[in-house]
Amino acid sequence: MADQTKKRYVTSEDLKKHNKPGDLWISIQGKVYDVSDWVKSHPGGEAAILNLAGQDVTDAFIAYHPGTAWHHLEKLHNGYHVRDHHVSDVSRDYRRLAAEFSKRGLFDKKGHVTLYTLTCVGVMLAAVLYGVLACTSIWAHLISAVLLGLLWIQSAYVGHDSGHYTVTSTKPCNKLIQLLSGNCLTGISIAWWKWTHNAHHIACNSLDHDPDLQHIPIFAVSTKFFNSMTSRFYGRKLTFDPLARFLISYQHWTFYPVMCVGRINLFIQTFLLLFSKRHVPDRALNIAGILVFWTWFPLLVSFLPNWQERFIFVFVSFAVTAIQHVQFCLNHFAADVYTGPPNGNDWFEKQTAGTLDISCRSFMDWFFGGLQFQLEHHLFPRLPRCHLRTVSPVVKELCKKHNLPYRSLSWWEANVWTIRTLKNAAIQARDATNPVLKNLLWEAVNTHG
């Protein structure tokens, strides 16, 4: 009883006032935590917390943190509790499900997917080296380019997995795998991926908070981008100018060609982040890993006999990775979108609304890297991909219970939905009555502040 009298209370409205850098509070299970100073040390990045600032973040916290993380909360507790703390039926069921998965050990039983994938990556790399260095046939070189593209896809899946949970027994080894599979093998910084990907997960399909939807002037999934909205992630305006209008007017035609060279933009984004003034965890290690890639890859290409074959080799290897770039878009482009920050109180609902699953046979799971179960992954990002197919029926049943969407489309259907979404926006972009701003070519590479 004495402890009860010492409690101090705030309302949810009071909590919302502490939602900016320097004055940043969050609540978890009714207890309030002041993370104003600590937010810069957050392993998942500042953006993830800033997106949910001044709110209850219990569901997101459960989704992204292991049980050991709860022990670190008490030192951030400022003594306040939320007086009108309320848990919805959806959240209550979600938390029960997460607890059940934890009790069954699903978050800890990682299987051997990473080992198998890295073994395949090693075999493909050996085949690529042999094809380029020991063969003179152009067909051998083309096959090597295809294998290199597939290698990059599978390596990216390992980087993705290791970024969400520890795929090995130790954190240092996990970090090494991140750098090898991301920076060294693919040339894409794991630091950049974590920065954008964590924000994407938290603010799934928010037009102004989710960086994975912000592709002006190349693509726009919603006509709301035509108002030149401000990206809360990049901290700059996404200008809808004459260049954007022209490109977006034909985006349903240019989608697949752009995906074939989309890797170039990821290289640019990596360099822009690593050499920016932003705080980048392990910046030196990330730069070192990128230097490894830009040493072996150009060197490998240089062993090809002429510039024509070199160009074809690079283009084919990049084009193969378009399969993965397209998949990322299929999971979200045709799903529901919204503007504004995510709401911690309907976190589960926002994840179901903003994602699409891709249906496939179990023998194709390796090809999609588990991301065909996009909703399951978004709800339980720490869940090893070997369990996603197992939990899928349970998630589907929970969505059905609460009348929430659970959309699982074939690869063909998902492409049709995506192209339809792009076409609808393209037709609207051609409307001359929509005002545009002055052209800024530099917007084409999503520059960072």
Swiss-Prot record:
Motif Histidine box-3 positions after renumbering to this chain: 374-378
Keyword hit for Metal-binding: yes
Keywords: Electron transport, Endoplasmic reticulum, Heme, Iron, Lipid metabolism, Membrane, Metal-binding, Oxidoreductase, Sphingolipid metabolism, Transmembrane, Transmembrane helix, Transport
GO molecular function: metal ion binding; sphingolipid 8-(E/Z)-desaturase activity
SUPFAM superfamilies: Cytochrome b5-like heme/steroid binding domain
Catalyses which reaction(s): an N-acyl-(4R)-4-hydroxysphinganine + 2 Fe(II)-[cytochrome b5] + O2 + 2 H(+) = a (4R,8E)-4-hydroxysphingenine ceramide + 2 Fe(III)-[cytochrome b5] + 2 H2O; an N-acyl-(4R)-4-hydroxysphinganine + 2 Fe(II)-[cytochrome b5] + O2 + 2 H(+) = a (4R,8Z)-4-hydroxysphing-8-enine ceramide + 2 Fe(III)-[cytochrome b5] + 2 H2O
EC category name: oxidoreductase
Motif Histidine box-1 per UniProt: ranges: 160-164
Keyword Chloroplast: no
Cofactor(s), names only, from the UniProt record: Fe cation
Tissues expressed in: Highly expressed in flowers and siliques. Expressed at low levels in roots, leaves and stems.
Protein name, as recorded: Delta(8)-fatty-acid desaturase 2
Biological source species: Arabidopsis thaliana
UniProt gene name: SLD2
